[in-house]
Amino acid sequence: MNKPRYDILREEFLAVVTELIGELTRFDKQVAACNPKKAMFRINRDIRFATDKRPYKTRFSAGITPKDLRRPSAGGGSTYYFQIDGSGKLQFGVGEYLPPAPRLKAIREHIVNDATGFAKVMKNKQLRATYGDLLDEDKLQRPPKGFDPQHVHVEYLKLKSFFVWTDIDLKVNQPDQLVPDLARGFKDAFALVTWLRSVEMSNPEE
């Protein structure tokens, strides 16, 4: 890795993340205190169980959350995630990706208890136009145990993530459009963020 060049690119990416947090705060006040440095993912790859032993990633990525908790296991809730790779591809998504079992169960229960509200989110015009449907990666073949197989949202109950995702070509000749484009894309998914934040976790001691 060319360390001097990486350091320059990292500082440029940090500036993007910092500016983006400011733009997101216009419609989502909860991310105002997000630390941009903590939002950025490390360049080092975990190669312990990987066949690809290259030590460094070929992309810059960040996850913006209210509590600086990017990972589902840390209980961070909805994340505004984006990455830029070396080929000029911009990918971004919003929601909860592979949340831990207790959180996943709570989301599924909320779908059942707030079927109308969830349906409204899934029909949101901005969400559908930008992202389409929820990511169905690792979707269950059968309904999860304890849930009605005839429920109107049974296909969504099978999901393991409640996350929307898209990718576009980076406007390399219009770098000043990056943050506005991301902010617009993230705002289009704010209905999903709001709904997920309404999911209540039960007290484990109950």
Give, region by region, the residue ranges found by the protein language model.
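Long, solvent-exposed, polar/charged low-complexity segments
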Residues: I8, F13-L24, I111-V112, T116, ...
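Hydrophobic, proline/glycine-rich low-complexity stretches
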Residues: M1-N2, T194
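Glycine-rich, often proline-containing surface loops adjacent to acidic residues and nearby aromatics
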Residues: M1, S87-F92, K160-T166
